[in-house]
């Protein structure tokens, strides 16, 4: 096989990766859709609840996510999850829907990522016994690279969440320390006032 033919074939065999990455604020319910063109593709899904709109409240209850197939069938569901990952093989081509539900009274910021992996393998164009294994190795390598990228994005979202949690905890610790300090000062003033009143009362009784 010529070099030109090899390059053309590589272009045909190279996998197509469709990715949806979004960070959004949810009130009650939000739905997104993603189209799968081929059966047998792999859909990777992940989400992380990054933060709440109230610095005094950080939601530990999580959100719900329900995945529906092209005909409305339920593929998978997550209940009250702060973060999760899931992947499945596309059984039917078409539009897949991802619906989030927030049961918290606060708005939540969610990092959502969908990756669709597809490898167009044309066996009729690759009869060479040395060329076919090469294409299989390329396919596995690219899939591994995209999986690493997917995992990295999920870990970055987890890191963002933890940073916000730590920041909120630090603010709460500072506010708590200030409150306790003011409470201690107030208690000291009250104690001085009561002792002074008691002393004045005893002094008045001794004069009588």
UniProtKB/Swiss-Prot annotation:
Probably oligomerizes with other members of the EMP24/GP25L family. Associates with the COPI vesicle coat (coatomer). Associates with the COPII vesicle coat (coatomer). Interacts with p24delta5. Keywords: Coiled coil, ER-Golgi transport, Glycoprotein, Golgi apparatus, Membrane, Protein transport, Signal, Transmembrane, Transmembrane helix, Transport. The chain crosses the membrane at residues 177-195. Involved in vesicular protein trafficking. Mainly functions in the early secretory pathway but also in post-Golgi membranes. Thought to act as cargo receptor at the lumenal side for incorporation of secretory cargo molecules into transport vesicles and to be involved in vesicle coat formation at the cytoplasmic side. Interacts with p24delta5 at endoplasmic reticulum export sites for endoplasmic reticulum exit and coupled transport to the Golgi apparatus. Glycans are attached at residue 168. The cytoplasmic C-terminal domain contains an Arg-Val motif, which is involved in the anterograde ER-to-Golgi transport of the protein. Residues 29-116 form the GOLD domain. Residues 1-21 form the signal peptide. A motif (COPII vesicle coat-binding) lies at residues 198-199. A motif (Required for the export from the endoplasmic reticulum to the Golgi) lies at residues 207-208. It is found in: Golgi apparatus, cis-Golgi network membrane; Golgi apparatus, Golgi stack membrane. This is Transmembrane emp24 domain-containing protein p24beta2. Its main location: Golgi. It comes from Arabidopsis thaliana. Pfam families: EMP24_GP25L. It comes from the Eukaryota. Residues 22-176 are lumenal. GO terms for cellular component: COPII-coated ER to Golgi transport vesicle; endoplasmic reticulum; endoplasmic reticulum membrane; Golgi apparatus; Golgi cisterna membrane. Residues 134-149 form a coiled coil. Residues 196-208 are cytoplasmic. Belongs to the EMP24/GP25L family. The keyword Zinc does not apply. GO terms for biological process: protein transport; vesicle-mediated transport. It is a single-pass type I membrane protein. The keyword NAD does not apply.
């Amino acid at each position: 096989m010529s070099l030109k033919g090899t390059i053309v074939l590589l272009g045909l065999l190279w996998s197509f990766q469709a990715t949806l990455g979004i960070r959004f604020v949810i009130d009650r319910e939000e739905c997104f859709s993603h189209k799968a063109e081929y059966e047998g593709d792999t859909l990777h899904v992940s989400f992380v609840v990054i933060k709440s709109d109230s610095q005094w409240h950080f939601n530990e209850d999580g959100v719900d996510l329900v995945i529906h197939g092209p005909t409305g069938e339920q593929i998978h569901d997550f209940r009250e999850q702060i973060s999760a990952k899931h992947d499945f093989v596309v059984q039917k081509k078409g539009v897949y829907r991802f619906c989030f539900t927030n049961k918290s009274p606060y708005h939540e910021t969610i990092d959502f990522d969908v990756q669709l992996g597809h490898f167009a393998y044309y066996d009729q164009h690759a009869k060479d016994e040395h060329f076919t294994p090469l294409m299989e190795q390329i396919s596995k390598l690219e899939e591994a690279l995209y999986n690493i990228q997917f995992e990295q994005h999920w870990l970055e979202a987890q890191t963002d969440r933890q940073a916000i949690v730590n920041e909120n905890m630090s603010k709460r610790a500072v506010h708590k320390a200030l409150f306790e300090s003011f409470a201690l000062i107030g208690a000291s003033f009250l104690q001085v006032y009561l002792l002074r009143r008691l002393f004045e009362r005893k002094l008045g009784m001794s004069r009588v």
